[in-house]
């Protein structure tokens, strides 16, 4: 797999050109930069994709950035595949839940809107990189707004990474107990089938040792494996739609054959439950947009992939993004649609876990679970790398590597994410909170703010600047509106829970 420099300290990108065919001739000295990984571990040298850390200690005061011409090496097809890896993440598991709480028609409208807005955001980001003279996300923040801009970019990327890491561990918490019960052929509630204990065991025995390594290069291969896992998962979701009857009969367990003739029922309520709905509004509808934004975030990976692209130009990179987003759009739509049509109102925030309502043991689903568990477990250490680098930098640590500091930061981060996974009630809350905050910042707010500030040749009255300004305003509305509604839902649930407890 092609690799490209993730950090550049000198650029000479012509503002008025449609191409940016320059590379850096010197690099920063960080030892710990990792590659972006959504539900994958693809590496663009030292870049992370759903997560990412482009903290730099460049001399930013210079007017001009000089660089030698150094063409990228990634083909169009490879770039499309890499960006697909960057987009695809655990968010796909929450899309059926979003559809179940918006209806098919409303979900499709929202999915199309978020995909188009994400592509527009990529356009703004590429143009800003050309005009601003940097292919480093956080450096664009510094050039636009100084230290606050750099911190905003850094914190947003770190939050997105932390949310991604938590969502992966949540998948371990949900799915590993089911796998263990299947292998032991047992339904008891022993400690070794408790998700909280299993998350701690997996963290200490696998994730912590891998996270303490100074180099995770070999884990870059998990990216392709992760994407294949999700394709396999999608195929299984479509296949199972035609195997699982609706409504689900009580005690519908261990069905492996003869499901082509679902049980007859005269219950009109059950029939109503099995009828797909096109528009739904309820208390959970507020999570739909944050789940979608969480699923489409890949923007910190765009710039290093742009630098890596062979014969690069803005138009070519935009076409790469168009093809990748179209592919992920189709996968997301199919996964959401068939997951929703299978379970309708009964779908859970994490789709794969919903199948445990139907099958106590199923070989195909067991293979899917094992594959997904392997992928997410190997991805967590890669996602943790840039977070640790960011913390290192913010603490003002010296560039000299220190094992005690390295170990302390790693352990502290893993302790925090484990506490979050153990005490947060559902993965829906992680999708919702991170999608409404960090993802909204990375898709809507930061690219438009950087564009407005750094692209000088267009006046504020130009169509482009007006469009970017409206996009910025919409980003703030999405973030504040979603966060307010989600917090209100949390408060309502907490009060309802207290009343229910008090009633007994």
Swiss-Prot record:
Which residues of this UniProt protein bind Na(+)?
85, 379
Residues the record marks as carrying a glycan: 254, 258
Q: Which residues cross the membrane?
A: 80-99, 106-126, 162-180, 190-210, 219-239, 286-306, 323-343, 365-385, 407-427, 430-450, 466-488
Q: Looking at the keywords, is Repeat present?
A: no
Q: Where does the record say this protein resides?
A: Cell membrane
> Locations of Low complexity compositional bias?
19-28
Those parts of the protein on the Cytoplasmic side are 1-79, 127-161, 211-218, 307-322, 386-406, 451-465
- Region annotation (Regulates protein turnover upon amino acid deprivation) maps to 1-99
Which reaction is this enzyme known to catalyze? Answer: L-alanine(in) + Na(+)(in) = L-alanine(out) + Na(+)(out); glycine(in) + Na(+)(in) = glycine(out) + Na(+)(out); L-serine(in) + Na(+)(in) = L-serine(out) + Na(+)(out); L-proline(in) + Na(+)(in) = L-proline(out) + Na(+)(out)
User: What is known about regulation of its activity?
Assistant: Inhibited by N-methyl-D-glucamine. Inhibited by choline. Allosteric regulation of sodium ions binding by pH.
Give me the Extracellular side stretches, as residue ranges: 100-105, 181-189, 240-285, 344-364, 428-429, 489-504
Does the keyword Endoplasmic reticulum feature in the UniProt annotation? no
| Membrane topology, record value | Multi-pass membrane protein
Chain residue ranges for the region called Disordered: 1-28
Chief place of localization: membrane
Q: Which GO terms describe its cellular component?
A: plasma membrane
Please quote what the entry notes about the protein's domains.
The extracellular C-terminal domain controls the voltage dependence for amino acid transports activity.
Q: What does this protein do?
A: Symporter that cotransports neutral amino acids and sodium ions from the extracellular to the intracellular side of the cell membrane. The transport is pH-sensitive, Li(+)-intolerant, electrogenic, driven by the Na(+) electrochemical gradient and cotransports of neutral amino acids and sodium ions with a stoichiometry of 1:1.
Belongs to which family?
Belongs to the amino acid/polyamine transporter 2 family.
Official protein name in the record:
Sodium-coupled neutral amino acid symporter 2
State the organism's lineage: Eukaryota, Metazoa, Chordata, Craniata, Vertebrata
């Amino acid at each position: 797999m092609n690799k490209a420099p993730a950090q550049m300290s000198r650029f000479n990108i012509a503002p008025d050109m449609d191409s940016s065919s320059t590379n850096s001739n010197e690099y920063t000295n960080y030892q710990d930069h990792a590659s972006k990984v959504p539900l994958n571990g693809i590496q663009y040298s030292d870049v992370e994709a759903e997560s990412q850390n482009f903290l730099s200690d460049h001399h930013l005061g210079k007017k001009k950035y000089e660089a030698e011409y150094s063409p990228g090496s990634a083909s169009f097809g490879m770039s499309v595949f890499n960006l697909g890896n960057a987009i695809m993440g655990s968010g796909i598991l929450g899309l059926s839940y979003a559809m179940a709480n918006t209806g098919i028609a409303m979900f499709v409208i929202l999915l199309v809107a978020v995909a188009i807005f994400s592509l527009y955001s990529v356009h703004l980001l590429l143009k800003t990189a050309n005009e601003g003279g940097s292919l480093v996300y956080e450096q664009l923040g510094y050039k636009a707004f100084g230290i606050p801009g750099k911190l905003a970019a850094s914190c947003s990327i770190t939050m997105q990474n932390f949310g991604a890491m938590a969502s992966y561990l949540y998948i371990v918490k949900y799915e590993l107990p089911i796998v263990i019960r299947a292998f032991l052929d047992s339904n008891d509630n022993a400690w070794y089938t408790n998700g909280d204990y299993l998350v701690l065991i997996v963290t200490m025995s696998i994730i912590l040792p891998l996270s303490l390594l100074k180099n995770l290069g070999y884990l870059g291969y998990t990216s392709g494996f992760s994407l294949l896992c999700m394709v396999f998962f999608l195929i299984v979701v479509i296949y199972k739609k035609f195997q699982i009857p609706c409504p689900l009969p009580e005690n519908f367990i261990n069905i492996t054959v003869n499901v082509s003739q679902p049980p007859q029922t005269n219950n009109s309520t059950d029939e109503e439950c099995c009828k797909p709905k096109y528009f739904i509004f309820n208390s959970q509808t507020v999570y739909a947009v944050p789940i979608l934004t969480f699923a489409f975030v890949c923007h910190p990976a765009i710039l290093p992939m742009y630098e890596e692209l062979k014969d690069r130009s803005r138009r070519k990179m935009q076409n790469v993004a168009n093809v990748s987003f179209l592919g992920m759009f189709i996968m997301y739509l199919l996964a959401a649609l068939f997951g929703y049509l299978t379970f309708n109102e009964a779908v859970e925030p994490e789709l794969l876990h919903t199948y445990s309502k139907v099958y106590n043991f199923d070989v195909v689903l067991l293979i899917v679970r094992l594959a997904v568990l392997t992928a997410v477990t190997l991805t967590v250490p890669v996602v943790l790398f840039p977070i640790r680098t960011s913390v290192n930098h913010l603490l003002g640590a010296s560039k000299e590597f220190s094992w005690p500091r390295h170990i302390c930061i790693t352990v502290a981060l893993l302790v925090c994410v484990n506490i979050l996974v153990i005490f947060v009630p559902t993965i829906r809350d992680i999708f919702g909170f991170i999608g409404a905050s960090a993802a909204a910042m990375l898709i809507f707010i930061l690219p438009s703010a950087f564009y407005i500030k750094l692209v000088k040749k267009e006046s504020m009255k130009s169509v482009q600047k007006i469009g970017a300004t409206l996009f910025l305003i919409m980003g703030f509305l999405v973030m504040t509106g979603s966060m307010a509604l989600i917090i209100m839902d949390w408060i309502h649930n907490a009060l309802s829970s207290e009343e229910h407890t008090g009633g007994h």
